[in-house]
Regions:
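Bacterial Sec-dependent N-terminal signal peptides
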Residues: 1-23
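Beta-strand-rich domains and repeat architectures in extracellular enzymes and scaffolds
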Residues: 40-63
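Repeated scaffold domains used in trafficking and secretory/extracellular systems
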Residues: 46-48, 86-90, 138-145, 194-200, ...
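Entry beta-strands of beta-propeller and related beta-repeat scaffolds
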Residues: 56-58, 97-100, 157-164, 205-209, ...
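Recurrent small/Gly-Pro-centered beta-turn motifs in extracellular repeat architectures
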Residues: 61, 101-104, 164-167, 210-213, ...
Length: 363
């Protein structure tokens, strides 16, 4: 059944039959509009996008390409094309320093790059492999950055902590840097889980990881882990009761309220209910809420503007809620929307980006 899982993942990474949307998407009774951006065509699901302000951002895909925009997504410049590399995640500390993770070998076809993490110090013009102490990291699926405020010689300053996890299909590994990415350490999480998909750190020490219990999808449950010691140890805070399930992506619009997408790969087409895990106590406990009763809506990305208003991407469409997940309405976010990033500028204005087969901007 592991091969069944790989085939399904490959379909949503390389299928060329995805529909294209070009019409602005205006949420009902909402000022926010999702607008499709013009980008280089890609025959499948692209995985991550990151912005440091309203204008400057980057996205990556499985063709080993990294693109940058300086005008809020109106135009994109290809900064890197690395054959044999499948980029899976990207994050930037500032306009110069950034990191891109790869899914690694022995998962998708034609992937030969064994380097799991790359770093740029010049805004993406050049990228170099990151060295680290600890066990070999096969691949990464997510990166999160925490800025810790402290007093430096009488002035407010920041320390930057960077966390990364992976991968889909196993093995499960964790990477961390506490010095702005200058040095890294890795550790195995195979005793806690078998797959890792996303990470959200609330501060230097506390956070959660989206995981799965088994690399065999037929036996896998969705799993959420929590740490209070910067990833040195983890405890289970949620596990689904059904087979063929994993978690995928996480969104915390506030300190206490958080949401995690639950993926179902059950081949039984009569199993239709899609679910999301929700916490109201900062990730200590979780409850399942229903998304939609359709078997063709496997979940991917999730992003919330506030505690109640959020979006989910699925294989077939997007969904929006304005009441904390009690009800959902179908919207167009393109297909296989894998990552939704929601930001606020200095004036409190909300903007965001989503990436899947296509890129969309929320403003």
């Amino acid at each position: 059944m592991r091969n069944f899982f790989l085939i399904l993942c490959s379909v949503f990474s390389f299928s060329s039959i995805f529909a294209q949307f070009s019409t602005p998407i205006n949420s009902e009774n909402s000022a926010e509009i999702w607008q499709k951006l013009s980008t280089e065509k890609y025959p499948g699901k692209q995985d991550d996008i990151a912005f440091i302000d309203e204008l400057k951002g980057w996205y990556i895909n499985g063709y080993g390409k990294i693109f940058r925009t300086n005008d809020g997504g109106k135009t994109w410049e290809k900064q890197l094309e690395k054959k044999g590399t499948f980029f899976r995640c990207i994050a930037f500390v500032d306009s110069l320093t950034g990191f891109a993770g790869t899914v690694g070998t022995d998962y998708f076809p034609n992937v030969t790059d064994t380097v799991s993490l790359y770093k740029t110090a010049d805004g993406g013009k050049s990228w170099n492999a990151v060295s680290y102490k600890g066990p070999y990291v096969k691949g990464l699926c997510a990166i999160d950055i925490v800025r810790e405020q402290y007093i430096n010689h009488g002035e407010i300053d920041y320390k930057t902590h960077i966390y990364a996890v992976g991968r889909v299909g196993s093995p499960a590994n964790f990477m961390v840097s506490h010095d702005n990415g200058a040095t890294w350490t890795s550790s195995s999480m195979n005793n806690d889980c078998k797959m890792l998909f996303d990470i959200k750190m609330f501060d230097k020490n506390n956070g959660i990881a989206c995981a799965a219990t088994n690399e065999d999808i037929e036996q896998s449950n969705a799993l959420i882990l929590k740490t209070d010691d910067a990833g040195k140890s983890w405890k289970k805070v949620f596990q689904s009761s059904r087979p063929f399930e994993t978690t995928w992506k996480v969104s915390f619009p506030s300190k206490n309220i958080g949401y995690v997408t639950i993926q179902s790969y059950n081949p039984d087409t009569t199993v239709k209910q899609q679910r999301i895990a929700k916490t109201t106590d900062g990730g200590n406990t979780w409850q399942e809420i229903n998304l939609v009763n359709e078997n063709n809506c496997r979940e991917f990305g999730i992003g919330f503007i506030d505690d109640n208003h959020g979006f989910v991407g699925t294989t077939s469409s997007g969904f929006e809620t304005k009441n904390g997940g009690e009800t959902w309405n179908k919207i167009d976010l393109g297909r296989a929307c894998n990552k939704i990033r929601i930001y606020k500028n200095k004036l409190g204005k909300t903007y965001g980006y989503s990436i899947g087969v296509d890129l969309y901007k929320l403003e």
